[in-house]
Every structure is written in C-alpha cells, then in structure tokens.
Amino acid sequence: MRTRAKNDKAILFERYWAMLAPAEFEPVSEYPFDKVIGRKHCFDVCFPQYRIGVEVDGGTWMKNGGRHNSEADMEKRNIAASLRWLVFHFTPQMLQRDPDGCVAMVLRAIRDSI
C-alpha cells in the first residue's frame, strides 16, 4: 500500500502534539479510516484505536469558502460520522494561537474514550 506524504498542516499539529501531549498517545498521519467500506479517505492525523481524527483545514484553500466546503469533503465528514469517528477541525492559525487548547481538546476526547 502506498502511503501519502505528510502535509505541512499535519506536521504543524504533530509538532505541537509532541511538545504538549503524553508520549503514550502517538498520532498516525494519513490514515485511511474508511478502508473497511472500500473507500480511500484519510485524516491529516488520527488516533485509530480511539476513532479520533484531526483535520487541519486552511491555507490557500480557505479563501472564498475554500476547498473544505466541497461535496467531497462533506461526503468524507459524513462517512466518518457514519463509522462513529470523532473528527476535530483546526486551522493553522488556531494551532498557532492556542496550541495548548487544541491539544487539550483532542487529549480530553482520547481520555474520555478509554
């Protein structure tokens, strides 16, 4: 199976995660969460054992509504919900402005799922 390269936004989340979260919760990049139904959608970062995904939306796509409002992205969100994944959406600006808060939100969800 071919793995997709990490994008800069995923790297940004992973950098803050490594600095602020316990090492026991290691994120996975570009995980194909819907492979079980024959699809190929991936989260930027996720924690598969807890069914928690992280999408870092933004950059050049955010202007004029952005790519993240497309039908394909809505389908991805709906598939994730139907498979009972909890998905967090952050922008790079949110991560830079409040990395502690973003990491704490995801960490709380992980701990609540244990």
Annotate each language-model stretch with its function.
Residues 1-114:
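Nucleic-acid endo/exonuclease domains
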